[in-house]
């Protein structure tokens, strides 16, 4: 009976988790099309995209898988949301990008608006994604694992990771 209740609880969380992952992906693509800036991870992903036949979504998925593997070796057991994040963010990025929904605006005001929209979408997406409490994304899981393993502050570990991928 307990397993059935857990499964029902898990299934009830899926729409919010998937919405959060979709919104996060839409925010990433919006910042990309603003042509005004991206997160260090997206800069890393675009560097790979520019030198391989991989799409941005595929690159995000492969990077996420590598990070999950690295995290596992330092003792971080990924949650269900971590694995779903790795797959679905990449899937949704490519889906949204191929849809042609976003276009780069011609004006600086339009570009700034799209960048701000993307940042807001990522912020709200994080809320939806974390609210279901099924685990952190691969990148945050790695950060949490390194903070515990190295006994260093979050700002230092997060900064070091993001500077490394730049």
List PLM regions with ranges:
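Core subunits and conserved enzymes of cellular information-processing
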Residues: 2-166
């Amino acid at each position: 009976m307990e397993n059935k209740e857990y499964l029902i609880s898990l299934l009830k969380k899926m729409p919010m988790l998937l919405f959060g992952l979709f919104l996060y992906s839409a925010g990433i693509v919006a910042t990309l099309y603003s042509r005004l800036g991206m997160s260090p991870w997206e800069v890393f992903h675009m560097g790979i995209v520019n030198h391989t036949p991989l799409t941005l979504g595929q690159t995000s998925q492969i990077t996420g898988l590598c990070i999950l593997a690295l995290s596992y070796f330092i003792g971080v057991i990924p949650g269900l949301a971590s694995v779903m994040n790795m797959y679905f963010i990449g899937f949704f990025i490519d889906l949204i990008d191929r849809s042609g929904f976003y276009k780069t605006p011609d004006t600086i005001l339009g570009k700034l608006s799209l960048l701000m929209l993307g940042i807001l979408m990522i912020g709200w997406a994080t809320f939806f994604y974390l609210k279901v409490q099924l685990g952190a994304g691969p990148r945050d899981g790695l950060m949490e694992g390194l903070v515990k393993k190295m006994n260093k502050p979050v700002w230092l570990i997060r900064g070091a990771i993001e500077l490394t991928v730049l």
